[in-house]
Amino acid sequence: MFYVAVLPVVLIPFILKTMPDSIGFMLKQGRQDELKVIARRLRPDLVIKDDTQLVGNPQIISAQDKPVRSLFLEGRGYSTVMIWMAFMTGLFMVYALNSWLTKLMAMAGFSLGSALNFVIVFNLGSIFGAILGGWLSDKFSIKHVLVVFYVVGAVALTLLGYTRSTELLFVVVFIVGASTLGTQLLAYAYAGDFYPSTIRSTGVGFASGVGRVGAIVAPVLIGALVSMALPLEQNFMAIALAGLIGAVAVTMINQSRSDSAVVRKKATVAHELT
């Protein structure tokens, strides 16, 4: 079974051949010939000679020199902290459930086999949630979709402690998977949307790294609650609380400072000037 872990290694040559580098990275490496090919495809009307030197925006180049500091510049500081909080709570829910869902369902009176089936349904729900969240984010504001997912996750987790019907429990667990693990996958997309390309990798990387605090705390905290022999409902409500905190954190993010909002604003101004 563990040999499955070799599969990503097999994909490395394919990824290296097919995944394109970003324009910013190619500029940094001085790959002028490749950049000119891309520029001619994007703007066939522009005259780009062989001796033309393509350069980056000076402000962007400056930001590349201090990527970590740039996370807190131009009004992004508070929102960066809120993104970290959202990641922490999202990963808290994911790792709490991955670590303790089987045990919690066994505490509810289910056999080990049935409890493991709940884990399978949980992960199937996460696939559905990620796809649905991505589709909804293309139709509506990704921030609003993320807030709704956090709230739905909190509500579903609370209901999980009070649902007694086995059939209904599978439905609720499916929704929990869609709105917790699915939410966390959506959070990565939102962080990427918030930061400009020059610091996008740094922004998403720091959010993911700081968010791991929630992943570390979750199994320990829920384990402590389980050892206290609290009612099952209170264990699920403790996990649900993280969802509510995550929803508040995302709500507090200043969307006007996101890269997508800034780009739209500049495009609107340019259109009005023309």
Q: Which sequence ranges carry the predicted segments?
A:
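Multi-pass alpha-helical transporter architecture, strongest
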Residues: 14-20, 24, 240-268
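Helix-loop junctions at membrane interfaces in 12-TM secondary transporters
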Residues: 162-171
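Structural signature of the two symmetry-related core transmembrane helices
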Residues: 144-158
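Intracellular cytosolic loops and amphipathic helices of Major Facilitator Superfamily
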Residues: 18-79, 261-274
